[in-house]
Curated annotation (Swiss-Prot):
The modification Phosphoserine is found at S116, S118, S268, S292, S371, S524, S530. It catalyses: A + NADH + H(+) = AH2 + NAD(+). Residues 100-127, 513-554 are annotated as: Disordered. The keyword Oxidoreductase applies. Under normal conditions, a 54-residue N-terminal segment is first proteolytically removed during or just after translocation into the mitochondrial intermembrane space (IMS) by the mitochondrial processing peptidase (MPP) to form the inner-membrane-anchored mature form (AIFmit). During apoptosis, it is further proteolytically processed at amino-acid position 101 leading to the generation of the mature form, which is confined to the mitochondrial IMS in a soluble form (AIFsol). GO terms for cellular component: cytoplasm; cytosol; mitochondrial inner membrane; mitochondrial intermembrane space; mitochondrion; nucleus; perinuclear region of cytoplasm. Changing E493V: In CMTX4; increases affinity for NADH and electron transfer activity; increases affinity for DNA, resulting in increased apoptosis; no effect on interaction with CHCHD4. Changing G308E: In COXPD6; with prenatal ventriculomegaly and severe postnatal encephalomyopathy; no effect on redox potential; slowered reduction with NADH; strongly decreased NADH oxidase activity; strongly decreased NADH oxidase activity; no effect on DNA-binding; decreased interaction with CHCHDE. Residues 1-54 form a transit peptide. The modification N6-succinyllysine is found at K109. It comes from Homo sapiens. This is Apoptosis-inducing factor 1, mitochondrial.
């Protein structure tokens, strides 16, 4: 009895050892290549081995061998069936998840995920592929423009965007402009807004159905664009063309774009303050900041905006107009003499400041923050000149710090003057590495080295980087523009080096009812005015011959309805601001591209038809 059992166990061991050896000698890559049929994977080696064993066995062992064979084959068949059933169910579940997710907004997806989590259901996470041809680090405007450019030149391209932001790629300008003027009570959920021309659109570049699953990306025949949201690249290995994510996963690439953007700067006075001050301070940048500030604006009695640049002035006007109905006090303070004092000449900066005040904002120029604390439940801001400001909430809009953490592991150069990754005129930092958007310090072949933090630059540089990643080898020559709207009535577009420290010449005329951002979008059909620009460089425009004349300085207190401001360096126009003049950017671009000296800029201003009714 015991002998027979021992013989049976020994026979079974002899038959299983070759099987284990057959499976184990394979490398992980070879095992992955094995057919998915579990019966084939196990039965064939067993059958061959057992045939050899049975041929040398006596009649007394045949019965046991046959029993063992039947047992093994039966177990293998059952296992294969279970494996096939499990695989089919997983595929069905994955298919249903993809179908049910199509057309959902990020908010609806988040709500669905939260509901699943509350019911104890495991929420599936999109997994990163191990390799992609095109890897884009960052999920902003530059990355999306690059993805679109890559796919335009290579329709079968597989593009992966890795974004730290939980949202799909979206445009930032409406966060401080149109969204605040929406009459939709659910605007923070829908993130849809009416442009100044009354047309409605979403803040997202594309709906969720536009994108493919990241884990399916390598297997899709015609390629596509996938987005991994809520993931951060923490390490860049340029030698092995590999990145590491904050969840530990690794991705190899062939071409890589760094479009990491920037982080809002804070004030040292706020950084030194306690946790309560920081919790009641908004560093405005993302969708989450808009949602949070919109809610806060309806709950507090006073909001103070620190910063007098584009973002600070736009938010001040938006909150000021909104506060009229709520009775909220809106304060704006900054160290310059007037709004946008670093950009506009002093007379226009002062006029802009009065415009902001007419929107119901208490504007405090020449204000330098010394400290911030808490007193009797209020935030107390102390200024260097002794003035004090009490408020319920602070919005800091004091600039952007480029995200350059990857420079350390990637061995990339940071520009000591402008910040950002230092790249050449083709936006390339290293072999197979390009940089675009706010984080790129690039060489402008016309104006020298620069770093620009505007939407249109993100579009232009992202598009160029995408072209060069597919072999175009083009330099950065297209001058990007930027614009700012102080509500639907006053706005301006600018291009080139726009710095109030440069000499300026302004030519103005009386505005008509059509000279405002609202009318501009009615003509162009879009509130994101860079999207309405054509690729033409106004090549047929002829600059009129100059006649010596002395430019007349604008009269203080004048109502600057519309006009052109030229910024000069060595008597050459290097920057232009179009004040309430829209859809004339190709003309301004050509003037800067020509780089000629002009004796009478009044003649040049005629190109913009500012005296037309």
């Amino acid at each position: 009895m015991f002998r027979c059992g021992g013989l049976a166990a020994g026979a079974l061991k002899q038959k299983l050892v070759p099987l284990v050896r057959t499976v184990c000698v394979r490398s992980p890559r070879q095992r992955n290549r094995l057919p998915g049929n579990l019966f084939q994977r196990w039965h064939v080696p067993l059958e061959l081995q057992m045939t050899r064993q049975m041929a040398s066995s006596g009649a007394s062992g045949g019965k046991i061998d046959n029993s063992v064979l039947v047992l093994i084959v039966g177990l293998s068949t059952v296992g294969a069936g279970a494996y096939a059933y499990k695989t089919m169910k997983e595929d069905e579940k994955r298919y249903n998840e993809r179908i049910s997710g199509l057309g959902l907004t990020p908010e609806q997806k988040q709500k669905k995920a939260a509901l699943s989590a509350s019911e104890g259901e495991e929420v599936p996470q999109d997994k990163a592929p191990s390799h992609v041809p095109f890897l884009l680090i960052g999920g902003g405007t530059a990355a999306f423009a690059a993805a679109r450019s890559i796919r335009a030149r290579d329709p079968g391209a597989r593009v992966l965007i890795v974004s730290e932001d939980p949202e799909l790629p979206y445009m930032r300008p409406p966060l401080s402009k149109e969204l605040w003027f929406s009459d939709d009570p659910n605007v923070t959920k829908t993130l849809r807004f009416k442009q100044w021309n009354g047309k409605e659109r979403s803040i997202y570049f594309q709906p969720p159905s536009f994108y493919v699953s990241a884990q399916d990306l390598p297997h899709i025949e015609n390629g596509g664009v996938a987005v991994l949201t809520g993931k951060k690249v923490v390490q860049l290995d340029v030698r092995d063309n590999m990145v590491k994510l904050n969840d530990g996963s690794q991705i190899t690439y062939e071409k890589c774009l760094i479009a990491t953007g920037g982080t809002p700067r804070s004030l040292s006075a706020i950084d030194r303050a306690g946790a309560e001050v920081k919790s009641r301070t908004t560093l405005f940048r993302k969708i989450g900041d808009f949602r949070s500030l919109e809610k806060i604006s309806r709950e507090v009695k006073s909001i103070t905006i620190i910063g007098g640049g584009f973002l600070g002035s736009e938010l001040a006007c938006a909150l000021g107009r909104k506060a009229r109905a709520l009775g909220t006090e809106v304060i704006q303070l900054f160290p310059e003499k007037g709004n946008m004092g670093k950009i506009l000449p002093e007379y226009l900066s002062n006029w802009t400041m009065e415009k902001v005040r007419r929107e119901g904002v208490k504007v405090m120029p020449n204000a330098i923050v010394q400290s911030v604390g808490v007193s009797s439940g209020k935030l107390l801001i102390k200024l260097k000149d002794g003035r004090k400001v009490e408020t319920d909430h602070i919005v800091a809009a004091v600039g952007l710090e480029p995200n350059v953490e990857l420079a350390k592991t990637g061995g990339l150069e940071i520009d000591s003057d402008f910040g950002g990754f230092r790249v050449n005129a083709e936006l390339q930092a290293r072999s197979n590495i390009w940089v675009a958007g706010d984080a790129a310090c690039f060489y402008d072949i016309k104006l020298g080295r620069r770093r620009v933090e505007h939407h249109d630059h993100a579009v232009v540089s992202g598009r160029l980087a995408g072209e060069n990643m597919t072999g175009a080898a083009k330099p950065y020559w297209h001058q990007s523009m930027f614009w700012s709207d102080l509500g639907p009535d006053v706005g301006y577009e600018a291009i080139g080096l726009v710095d109030s420290s440069l000499p300026t010449v302004g030519v103005f005329a009386k505005a008509t009812a059509q000279d405002n951002p609202k009318s501009a979008t009615e003509q162009s059909g879009t509130g994101i005015r860079s999207e309405s620009e054509t690729e033409s460089e106004a090549s047929e425009i002829t600059i009129p011959p100059s006649t010596p004349a002395v430019p007349q300085a604008p009269v203080q207190g004048e109502d600057y309805g519309k006009g052109v401001i030229f910024y000069l360096r060595d008597k050459v126009v290097v920057g232009i601001v179009l004040w309430n003049i829209f859809n004339r950017m190709p003309i301004a671009r050509k003037i800067i591209k020509d780089g000629e000296q002009h004796e009478d800029l009044n003649e040049v201003a005629k190109l913009f038809n500012i005296h037309e009714d």
